[in-house]
């Protein structure tokens, strides 16, 4: 009788323990599943929420404007593609016009590529020198690649993913409003060596086309001539052009 009672107690204890483990496992699985689903929903909702309240321009990149903030929506198909930045003067004050700087003058060109990094949740921007190239499969191709690497000039946090993950949203204000010089280094390029006053500068507008993006900006600085400080505001146009997948034949 005592042995039977002991066996019954052991069996009941084992049953309770098994039930507890099963409940804990199930709770943990549902918790992980819930977190995963919440994460996806949050990401999708952020994209949908942002696009819903934005003024959108269709083109090479979709441009979304939310009040004073500007976003590029970059498709995966455009990651790692060759792009050319062309910066031109669109309007100058008297002092610079008198010194020979006129509307229409180009002052900075740059080749860039966008690279999506889902591990660090960033989009990197690199530049390189096109004068150094080698045919793919050539015996020295690897050596050339190692000795003439692309340089990173900018990074953008990924603000949101498109629901099917085929595109990302990045906020691009900083490279056009004078905060950073990576896309538009106006005053160094025209040999003034001055810094942009961000609080007195702004993005004038953006337009999207099938093969390019156009950005207008008003960049202000202040230079000192003798005892006099002179404020200067220059209107610039930045054109980001999609280059052919097969590089064009060089002239030389």
Regions found by a protein language model. Give the residues of each.
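Auxiliary tRNA-acceptor-end handling modules of aminoacyl-tRNA synthetases
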Residues: 27-252
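Bacterial N-terminal signal peptides that target proteins for export
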Residues: 1-10
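Bacterial N-terminal signal peptides
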Residues: 10-19
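Intrinsic-disorder/low-complexity regions
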Residues: 6, 22, 36-37
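Sec/Tat signal peptide C-region and signal peptidase I cleavage site
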Residues: 20-26
